[in-house]
């Protein structure tokens, strides 16, 4: 059995080193995406991605009700954008449904550094900056009707949207 022959995979193997070592010969000539996790705890774990994010999110798209996530609607993603699989996936989801994905990047590694340095005021300013960028995009682009964000960003966005009678499907 292959699993017995190969042994248990160690997640730490993903930290550093040539990423191409994980690309099998069958995919060596395919476009490869890389994404990272765990960068706030040292060298990030780098993982490869070929087409699975497209396949996953095209299937996911079929579960979205068109009345809540209209085809052709533009999307706004507020969250970590790169190097993240999620950014690729949400951008592809918007495109697959006929829309454009606008992005506001949130750098969680920077937020963690600010917290570790005790820079809570600076962290709050950064959070406000991210929300302000999102609101600017929402005001500038009437076609944005769908939102992908983290729960911690959703609340302040809603607090700023509802009084101004702006609405998106979240």
Predicted feature locations:
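Nucleotide 5′-phosphate-binding alpha/beta core
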Residues: 1-36, 42-74, 80-83, 140
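Short loop/turn segments at strand-loop or loop-helix junctions that form parts
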Residues: 36-39, 102-109, 151-152
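Acidic/glycine-enriched edge-of-secondary-structure segments
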Residues: 42-52, 111-123, 143-148
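Short amphipathic alpha-helical face segments that pack within enzyme cores
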Residues: 55, 59, 89, 153-156
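Conserved AMP-binding loop of ANL adenylate-forming enzymes
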Residues: 66-104
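Short, well-ordered, mixed-charge alpha-helical segments that flank or form enzyme active sites
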Residues: 83-87, 109-116, 155-157
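Short, flexible helix-coil linker/hinge segments at the edges of structured domains or between repeats
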Residues: 94-130
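Adenylate-forming
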Residues: 119-170
């Amino acid at each position: 059995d292959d699993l017995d022959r190969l042994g248990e995979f160690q997640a730490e193997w993903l930290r550093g080193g040539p990423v191409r070592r994980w690309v099998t010969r069958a995919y060596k000539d395919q476009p490869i995406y890389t994404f990272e996790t765990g960068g706030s705890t040292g060298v990030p774990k780098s993982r490869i991605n070929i087409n699975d994010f497209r396949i996953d999110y095209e299937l996911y798209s079929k579960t979205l009700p068109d009345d809540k996530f209209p085809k052709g609607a533009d999307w706004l993603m507020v969250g970590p954008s790169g190097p993240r699989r999620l950014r690729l996936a949400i951008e592809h989801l918007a495109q697959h449904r006929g829309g454009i994905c606008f992005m506001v990047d949130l750098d969680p590694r920077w937020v963690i550094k600010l917290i570790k340095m005790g820079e809570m005021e600076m962290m709050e300013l950064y959070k406000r900056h991210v929300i302000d960028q999102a609101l600017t995009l929402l005001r500038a682009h009437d076609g944005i009707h769908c939102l992908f964000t983290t729960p911690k960003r959703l609340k302040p966005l809603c607090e700023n949207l509802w009084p101004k009678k702006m609405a998106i499907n979240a």
